[in-house]
């Protein structure tokens, strides 16, 4: 809500006198808010945004344009954008009723045009955006993006929403077999590679564990973790009868990822890595 002041001046006979100061307020007819779900992001994740418009006036607000800057920030000589609109996801509501989808310019910036907010009513835009490689994945990473509503006599109301980089570990595991063709009674080796793409290390308190059922079962197995020999039952358990192999919860630890920003503005993630190797005869 903006306020204004005004003072009159009276001139007479070479003299000048000022009036009292009067103060008024300009009550904004349109209120704009913006929310994001979820509030934490990772590169490649989908964020749902909700733009909520409230018209407190007695006349409908028509022909509005809603512009989202997609979190763009200056990098080098240009701009980079940590968000990308997901085509076809917008839903437009007036007083809670679903309307035909507005015209969309994916941008950046992202624009929705032809929006109407009923008199004394509400409108909402719900849409999704993908987190791009320009989003900082670091522990202090933030995406701040602003929506601006223009049209008619509106001055350009804005609303800003911030989401923060997820602080959780993000693990992936891959499994490799060597050799792919093995002779009867030959030796097989399974290599499990565990990668952490998150900014937080996985330590013993996280109780991470790997479980597998080897078929065919392995006999006389040997196990190493990051090149260090492991022994049962402290580090793992294994049943040669069933082929069920399990590491002891907490023995799997994986360092945090490292992050660097490239010259083009994209972030490169170097995951923390751990390697579990199990060998035996069939």
Feature-to-residue mapping (PLM):
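Exported/extracytosolic protein signature
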Residues: 1-282
């Amino acid at each position: 809500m903006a306020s204004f002041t005004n003072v009159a001046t009276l001139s007479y006979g070479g003299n000048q006198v000022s009036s009292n100061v009067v103060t008024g307020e300009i009550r904004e007819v349109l209120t704009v808010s913006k929310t994001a779900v979820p509030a934490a992001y990772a590169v490649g994740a989908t964020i749902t945004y909700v733009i909520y418009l409230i018209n407190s006036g007695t006349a409908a607000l028509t022909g509005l344009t809603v512009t989202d800057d997609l979190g763009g920030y200056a990098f080098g000589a240009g701009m980079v954008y940590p968000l990308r609109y997901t085509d076809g996801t917008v839903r437009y509501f007036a007083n809670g009723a679903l309307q035909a989808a507005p015209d969309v310019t994916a941008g950046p910036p992202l624009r929705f045009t032809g929006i109407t907010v009923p008199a004394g009513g509400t409108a909402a835009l719900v849409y999704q955006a993908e987190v791009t490689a320009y989003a900082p994945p670091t522990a202090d990473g933030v995406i701040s993006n602003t929506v601006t509503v223009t049209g008619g006599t509106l001055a350009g109301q804005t609303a800003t929403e911030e989401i923060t980089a997820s602080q959780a570990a993000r693990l992936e595991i891959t499994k490799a077999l060597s050799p792919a063709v093995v002779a009867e009674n030959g030796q097989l080796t399974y290599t499990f590679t565990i990668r952490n793409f998150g900014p937080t290390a996985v330590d013993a308190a996280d109780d991470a564990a790997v479980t597998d059922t080897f078929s065919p079962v392995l006999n006389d197995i040997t196990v190493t973790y990051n090149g260090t020999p492991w022994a049962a039952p402290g580090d793992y358990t294994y049943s040669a009868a069933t082929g069920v192999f399990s590491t002891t919860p907490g023995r799997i630890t994986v360092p945090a990822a490292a992050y660097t920003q490239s010259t083009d503005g994209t972030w490169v993630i170097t995951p923390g890595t751990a390697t579990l190797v199990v060998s035996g005869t069939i």
